[in-house]
Amino acid sequence: MKVSVSWLKDLVEFNNDIDELSEKLSMTGFEVESLEDLSEQAKNVVIGFVEEITPHPNAEKLKVCSVDVGLPKKLSIVCGAPNVKAGFHVLVAKVGAYLSSKSLKIKLSNLRGVESEGMICSLEELGIESSNEGIEILEENEANIPPIGSNAVDYLCLNDTIIELAITANRPDGMSMVGIAREISTITNSKLTLPNLNYIEDFNIFEPKICDKETIGVDCIYSITYIDSIDNTGKTNKNIFNKLSSLKQNCINPVVDITNYLMLEQGQPLHAFDADLLDNIIGRKVKPNDFGIRNGKQGELFVALDKKEYKINPTIKLITCDDIPIAIAGVIGGNNSSVSDKTTRIWLEAAVFTPTSIRNSSREIGLRTDASSRYEKGISSNMTTAVSKRASELISVQLGGDNISSYVNTDFKKKSISVNLRMDKINSVLGKLSSSDSNFVNNNSTKLRYLNEDEIETLLSKLGLILTSNDSGWNVQVPPYRSSDLTREIDLIEEIARLIGYDNFDSNMPDPLEPGVLSPTKLVERRLRNSFIHNGFQEVVTSSLVGPENTDDNAVLIKNPLLSETSRLRTNVWDEHLKILQRNVSFGAEGCWIFEIAKTYKKDKECFVETNLLSGALTGSKRLSKWGGASKQLSLDYFEARGKLKQSLDVLGVETIDKQLAEKDFMHPGRTSELFVEGKSIGFFGQIHPSQSEKFDLIKETYLFNLDFDSLIKAATRKTNWTRIYKDYPTVPYMERDIALIHSKKYSSLEIMGLIKKTGRPLLEKVELIDRYEGSSMPEDEISQAFRIRYRDAKKTLVEKDINPIHEKIRNALKEKIKAELRS
């Protein structure tokens, strides 16, 4: 938002210098992005008088002018403007001047054999106007001509500074000169003098054809005003022209300039349609009810004021006259109804549209205008009709407008927001004043104290709030222009702190000051992340937003997506994980092991369900090097991949049980297991289906895991698992025996290990798979495996006679239960 200091001084009486004012604005939330001194545009540009003109000896279209600029010697300047005449005052850029709009430095030059000692300028060359109608002749525009040789700054009204402010989304009132003037009045304790707005509700009710209810919401408004007998052929009022020019607004014609002027002044966009052109469009005289709002049609074309043709779709909202598009709502008007110097009758639109609808339309056509930027932040409907009436009055006074008739789509009443503000709540939130550099409090003593009621009333009244005292504090009525950000008690308290200055309040540290402690959940999560990283995994973070290729019927759709590729929330994580593996392998990585703690989202009837997952994927091999040893090549088969996951999960202190998973579309049917913790299924681990390997151009030995993170954390932080119980270190040795067997493939190694553990109690301490073989030398439905069993008695050293009965019992159980053929 660009703000003219000269314009501000018409609205508020402040005496602060520009740097001090900029500092105050920045400290109260209006960050100053840049300062521009407009007088630099007219540096070395002076008032000159053309005394004599002679033809150029070597160029038919050029003239040699003798110009008096207040120096002892007249300047000889070569000029090609057709309207240059002797006996008139002009603007002269002397040698050394820099015209920033043209990036041109004026030098002593030789033009076709004649020396030129400067340049006679047009307003376009000085960056004042966009039109190029020749040089500026002062007698045509100014009765009181400045002295010859004087600086042109005052004549050009460039004795001004432009402050560019960053306006936050919660302060749409800052998108107007009046809004910034109110802020400056408050922070500098200065008198405010604002233009009067007429809130008398004398608009007629009409029924526009609003087919799209999303554009005009409950708190929105649509009004039009008919004005005829306008003389739009002259020049714009000088005051309005100068203010628009200072803010780099193109001056078009008086009607359009008045609408732009009021948009900058009040923050309410206005748009004027040429009534005669509208009559021609629909083939009859336009009536108020002919106006409407609808969605665009796919493939519809629209030529806007910028002469560009835009392709319309149903996301874009259109203003129509008898269903014919005449504007893109809140963004830009149509070329078919544009106001020109020939316009004598207009329909003036003043409306408030929903921010979302304007944002969508603006994004779809790739155009952001001054009007759309204001609508996107939100505008109060309370001021719309009043600003429209002010525009009608200016047009009537300056351009002779007559027969004014105003219409509005609803019997709109000014809405007020009331907030209860408690004195004790202010004190408890803000604490005591430690010092004060503020205009609102006086705390010269070093003693800490709370704000008093008079100080609070003075400050809030300056903001335009109306306070009514009650037992606990005040009932505060919020003005329309602050209705978007002052809706709660805490908002008012924040406003008090913002204006007094946060650094003027005493800072209280917690007493006693205790170090922060991670909760068990966060501690386990941190340990788990570190464990995965130590085992060779890399953590990734993927986007929660996905495109329409996610065809899950339960996917949560985004109502206002920025792109079609981010139009819904993900229902799984593995799709993106497989893409990451694909990218890394395509870039030459030998292997890629990744994990992520992430959320997925689904619809469940009327509710939305978020699920916390621990997911990951592994493909290829990795080299894990250690100090003092050579790198070891790890080839990744099913059991090694599952082993890496097991090692990573061991830090949780919970046991995971694998059971074969019958079927999962994207997983290999014979190489996928369902994982259980404490008897509850928490997810799966396995090799991806060959079709997925082909789809993502990955090797077949690619593995996925997808686990319920909350269930894992719950089990890990359960008191029996979380509270570590001290166990004496064994003082007696263990004994180990191996069992090798051939058995049917229908029995998994985990089932066999479970049977061994159950049978070998109480001396069996540990069992692990140490060898596995399947191949052409064995029947297709059989497999050979070897297990190592560890026995130990905590009280004594075991001997053969202690172990033999139990070991034989295990062998018999394997023969009977799974029909195993024992090899050892």
Curated annotation (Swiss-Prot):
Matching PROSITE patterns: B5, FDX_ACB, TRBD
Compartments it resides in: Cytoplasm
Domain B5: 414-507
Reactions it catalyzes: tRNA(Phe) + L-phenylalanine + ATP = L-phenylalanyl-tRNA(Phe) + AMP + diphosphate + H(+)
Entry's Gene Ontology BP terms: phenylalanyl-tRNA aminoacylation
Cysteines engaged in disulfide bonds, as pairs: none
Cellular component, GO annotation: phenylalanine-tRNA ligase complex
Keyword Nucleotide-binding carried by entry: yes
Domain of life: Bacteria
Domain tRNA-binding: 39-153
InterPro entries for the chain: aa-tRNA-synth_II/BPL/LPL, B3/B4_tRNA-bd, DNA-bd_dom_put_sf, Fdx_antiC-bd, Fdx_antiC-bd_sf, NA-bd_OB-fold, Phe-tRNA-ligase_IIc_bsu, Phe-tRNA-ligase_IIc_bsu_bact
Primary location recorded for the protein, binned into one broad class: cytoplasm
GO molecular function: ATP binding; magnesium ion binding; phenylalanine-tRNA ligase activity; tRNA binding
EC number(s) given by UniProt: 6.1.1.20
Amino acids binding Mg(2+): D485, D491, E494, E495
Cofactor binding notes: Binds 2 magnesium ions per tetramer.
Enzyme class, spelled out: ligase
Family assignment from sequence similarity: Belongs to the phenylalanyl-tRNA synthetase beta subunit family. Type 1 subfamily.
Alphabetical list of PANTHER family matching this protein: PHENYLALANINE--TRNA LIGASE BETA SUBUNIT, PHENYLALANYL-TRNA SYNTHETASE BETA CHAIN AND LEUCINE-RICH REPEAT-CONTAINING PROTEIN 47
Official protein name in the record: Phenylalanine--tRNA ligase beta subunit
Lineage, highest ranks first: Bacteria, Bacillati, Cyanobacteriota, Cyanophyceae, Synechococcales
